Regions:
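Mature N-terminal segment immediately following signal peptide/propeptide cleavage
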Residues: 43-76
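Cap/lid segment of the alpha/beta-hydrolase catalytic domain
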Residues: 394-510, 517-518, 523, 551-560
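Active-site-proximal cap/loop segments of hydrolase catalytic domains
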Residues: 468-663
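Boundary at the C-terminal end of the N-terminal hydrophobic targeting segment
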Residues: 39-41
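Beta-propeller domains
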Residues: 73-96
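Bacterial N-terminal signal peptides
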Residues: 20-33
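Peripheral, non-catalytic segments that deliver or gate enzyme domains
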Residues: 54-59, 77-82, 99-105, 110-417, ...
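N-terminal secretory signal peptides that target proteins for export/translocation
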Residues: 1-17
């Protein structure tokens, strides 16, 4: 179909959907196309898009410092707003915001519980304004400048509950200077002005708001850290890391509350990270390569702090994540609590997402691949659990598909951790497959409830997500194997995964679609231009089509990470024009669906417009959706529901699955 459909989507408007439904819909006998028994298809109901991608009943829960209240997001007149509720029997929630256009951002409490802090931007432009909310009166006050300024919360401390350290790029859009903000008056004072690219992170302030660490990125992408303890007047070199070690997570963290130990992560002597700590007395005199103590060596995947003592700030629980996650206890005082929560979780996993100032009340989320997440309260002193909410309870009435963890191999032997969700409609035999590519590309896919996997499984498609080389979370070698491999070995990994699915009888070789957002969208475009015979169609959401223009238009505040980004892409070593799908449009033979937010500052709308125009001029089939009130991704559930409605019809047309009607 040689036609472009440019759709500007107004919130609440469905006329364009009905019109598009007439264009996209064809009579489809999906039962015969998928080899299903009619009774089987009838028994498994269609999960509505509204259930999968609409507003959750509740999400973004935060526990007050005294453990007696929660804030959360819940719908009001169809839009997520912020609410607060006391944790006592019979207490009713009270709404604090009145957003009518775009979902409210989550909030969290100041250390004294006096205020809630939240944020907003303008339709996805990422110019974030910080907002102070009174949880009693609902009075709101903007704390930071608006237009053209990206504000971020850097630090809060219980010993200075009336203050907040924020980062603002109002002086120079490339860099975030640090300011101490008075929460009552809104007045601010300069704490640290970035000079020569020296950046300061959240963990690198002491309890008197003094900067003790700074970092700078070298010309080759390496990272250097300088240290200045409060008792010293001069900065001196502390740590230096190569580009490879810095990219894979090596760096200092923060002091625990007594100031005796500074914690950090190193990946300098192996493939997997290790947690270390430096003694303050040693730091007073050493320079570079200071001796440290080993806290824990990761055995697989990534390593994060899962729980810290709120009084001492010492890490209590570590979480290692490979294909699945596991917890490691550093502080045995919490062992009985974790054992009780594991018993309560059953086959599910759980995360401790918040706690009160005394560490007695925990906010816990239980989650799995086939059940709506649940928020619970765990009282340590009483060893009792209280269920608060299910995020999307209506989802639990439908048959959901399990997510399988896989160990695939690339053609050069590299391990490819992957996840497969099989169609809930399929009998034995090859089925249509959607290869869903994650963005980043320095990111990863995880095991768990994935609404898009569930949508596709419910409509009759297998879905495969692959952690290709360059993904994070699977060791330094796996990450660095992606260096300079856009349009090359990173794409080979995706092709190898599809080949495996075909050779094992999982995928129908004539019905494979590649789909993704951001870098995943780029990979979808690369799939159509580099391997035009392999994929029946492609779906690109906010993906770049031209690597040269992508790098030329990155936001100013990305300048500090420009060099590492360019090194991973391979600037100076690879032909950027050659790895840009736009320059291979003449190779496209299959249909393409593109969606983009008009306010995207990371991947400009022009990245999609140019390839659409190039395809249109050649009479190639492309469907193009523009969302005027979105940025880099679809935040508004109404837009997400609309997009996935178009996606369903697109896939049904080219793969033969079923689809919930549009409109």
């Amino acid at each position: 179909m040689n036609q472009v459909w440019l759709i500007s989507m107004a919130v609440g408007s469905t006329k364009w959907l009905r019109k598009l439904a007439l264009l996209l819909s064809l009579p489809i006998s999906f039962i015969s196309a998928l080899g299903l028994r009619p009774a089987q298809a009838e028994q498994i109901g269609v999960i509505p898009r509204e259930v999968l991608f609409g507003n959750p009943e509740i999400i973004g829960v935060s526990l007050s410092p005294d453990g007696e209240r929660i804030s959360f997001l819940a719908p009001h007149k169809g839009v997520l707003n912020l609410w607060v509720q006391d944790l006592i029997d019979g207490a009713q929630p009270r709404r604090l915001t009145n957003r009518t256009d775009r979902p409210q951002d989550p909030a969290f409490w100041t250390p004294d519980g006096r205020y809630l802090l939240t944020s907003r931007d303008a339709n996805g432009d990422e110019n974030t304004v910080l907002i102070r909310l009174d949880p009693v009166t609902a009075e709101a006050e903007e704390l930071t400048p608006g237009e053209g300024v990206l504000a971020g919360i850097v630090a809060l401390d219980r010993r200075a509950p009336g203050e907040l350290v924020v980062g603002l790029n109002d002086r120079d859009p490339r860099y975030h200077d640090l300011w101490v903000l008075d929460l009552e008056s809104g007045k601010r004072r300069l704490l640290h002005q970035v000079e020569d690219g020296n950046q300061v992170g959240a963990a690198w302030l002491d309890n008197a708001w003094r900067v003790i660490l700074r970092k700078r990125i070298a010309a080759d992408g390496g990272i250097a850290y300088d240290l200045r303890l409060p008792e010293s007047k001069e900065w001196r070199p502390f740590l230096e890391f190569s580009f490879e070690d810095g990219l894979s997570g090596s760096g200092p963290g923060s002091f625990e509350r007594s100031g005796t130990w500074m914690y950090g992560t190193l990946s300098t002597e192996g493939d997997l990270p290790r947690m270390v700590r430096w003694n303050r007395e040693t730091l007073k005199t050493c320079e570079l390569n200071c001796p440290y103590e080993l806290v824990h060596q990761a055995e697989s995947g990534s390593m994060d702090i899962g729980l810290s003592d709120p009084n001492t700030l010492l890490p209590q629980v570590l979480v290692e994540t490979d294909l699945r996650s596991r917890k490691l206890i550093l502080d045995q005082s919490v062992a009985p609590d974790l054992k009780a929560l594991e018993k309560l979780a059953g086959s599910r996993q759980f995360s401790i997402v918040d706690q009160d100032l005394e560490g007695d009340t925990w906010l816990v989320v239980f989650h799995s691949d086939r059940q709506s997440p649940e928020y619970w309260i765990w009282k340590r002193s009483e060893q009792e659990a209280l269920k608060l909410f299910s995020v999307q309870p209506s989802l639990d009435q439908y048959q959901l598909a399990p997510m399988e963890s896989l160990e695939l191999k690339a053609r050069d032997g590299l391990r490819l951790p992957a996840y497969l969700t099989r169609s809930t409609l399929a009998d034995q035999g090859p089925q249509p497959l959607v290869l869903l590519v994650h963005g980043g590309p320095q990111a990863r896919d995880y095991w768990g409830l994935n609404p898009l996997h569930q949508l596709l499984a419910n409509r009759g498609y297998h879905t495969l997500s692959v952690n290709y080389r360059g993904s994070t979370g699977f060791g330094k070698a796996h990450l660095l194997a992606g260096q300079g491999q856009w349009y090359a070995e990173m794409q080979d990994d995706l092709v190898d995964a599809v080949t495996w699915a075909i050779e094992t009888g999982i995928a129908d070789p004539e019905r494979v679609v590649i789909m993704g957002a951001s870098y995943g969208g780029y990979a979808a475009l690369a799939g159509l231009t580099r391997d035009p015979e392999l994929f029946a169609a492609a779906v690109d959401e906010v993906g770049p089509s031209n690597v040269e223009t992508l790098l030329a238009s990155i936001p100013p505040y990305w300048e500090p990470i420009r060099k590492p980004t360019e090194r991973m892409i391979g600037v100076g070593k690879v032909d950027l024009a050659e790895i840009s799908p736009l320059n291979h449009v003449d190779q496209i033979k299959r249909p393409l669906l593109i969606a983009h937010g008009a306010n995207d500052v990371r991947v400009k709308l022009s990245e999609s417009e140019t390839i659409v125009q190039a395809m249109k001029s050649r009479g190639l089939p492309v469907d193009f959706l523009v969302f005027p009130d979105e940025g880099h991704g679809l935040v508004n559930p109404r837009n997400a529901i609309a997009f996935y409605g178009v996606l369903e019809s697109f896939l049904s047309r080219y793969l033969g699955g079923r689809a919930e009607p549009l409109g």
